[in-house]
Amino acid sequence: GIPLVVTVHSLEPLRPWKREQLGGGYDFTCWLEKTTLEMADAVICVSEGTRRDVESLFQIEPSRLHIIHNGIDPDEYQPAKTHAVLDRFGIDRSKPYVLFVGRITRQKGIIHLVNAIQHFDPGFQVVLCAGAPDTPEIAEEMKTAVAAAQAKREGIIWIGEMIDNPSKIELYSHAAVFVCPSIYEPFGIINLEAMACGRPVVAAAVGGIPEVVVDGETGYLVPVQQMNESPFEPTEPAKFSRDLATRINELMADPAKCEAFGQAGRRRAAEVFSWSAIAQKTKALYDSLTR
């Protein structure tokens, strides 16, 4: 008689690249997810996009689906004044940089960002804080692509290790622009982290990202034509990379707009996505199930 609540952060059927990592275990995780979700009294979806996906993939009454976004602590994620991490990784303080933070996976779309570097205007650095590759194959693909980009452009810094939160916050805080080229992203907490640190975001307009990043206000959303079903790879990957570069170049050439977008992002993160606001919604749902 105890209610079961499940929170969905991603969906296995929409991540077929996990088979590269899990092998036959991928079929088991798909079955386990389906079984758990369909028996739950309530399913928390971290975005409207996730809710639509759950509704289309599983036999769940719409009344059992509830949208409660992920949250953030704006006191932890706020602009940092220190520069130790920049010095540690050889980032030139006198030059602006574009930043990526994330794992090396198909989902995060980092290869499309690396391919966009050839279209970047000169004069700024590119910092790729990217580690934990899903497979040896994608690790090698990343290594080859970055080496090719570095052969043609100076100022590409690849941080291949997973770093702690204070270090990550420092990287966010001093970036001119944060970039999220994900091709599958149910919510995209990294965008929220960057916004809370006062940085503008250029992100792919997929999944739950448009519910976080407000186009033309806290950053830019880049449309991407994708396959209609998983693995959702861009149908025109070269165009997607060029479009990312166009928006990045636009912001990098306009520090005043970067600052305005960054301030708006910080306000939005603190007012809409603080953990106190998210906790109230979560408590209300649990209260409704236990009355």
Question: Could you tell me what each predicted segment is?
Answer:
Residues 200-203, 213, 220-221:
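Short hydrophobic beta-strand element within catalytic cores of glycosyltransferases
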Residues 49, 71:
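Carbohydrate-associated surface elements
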Residues 170-175:
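Short alpha-helical donor nucleotide-sugar binding micro-motif in glycosyltransferases
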Residues 95, 139-166:
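Nucleotide-activated donor-binding/catalytic signature segment of Leloir-type glycosyltransferases, i.e.
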Residues 96, 100-119, 140:
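A conserved mid-protein helix/loop that constitutes part of the nucleotide-sugar donor-binding site
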Residues 2-5, 14-35, 55-56:
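Nucleotide-sugar donor phosphate/pyrophosphate-binding loop at the beta->alpha transition
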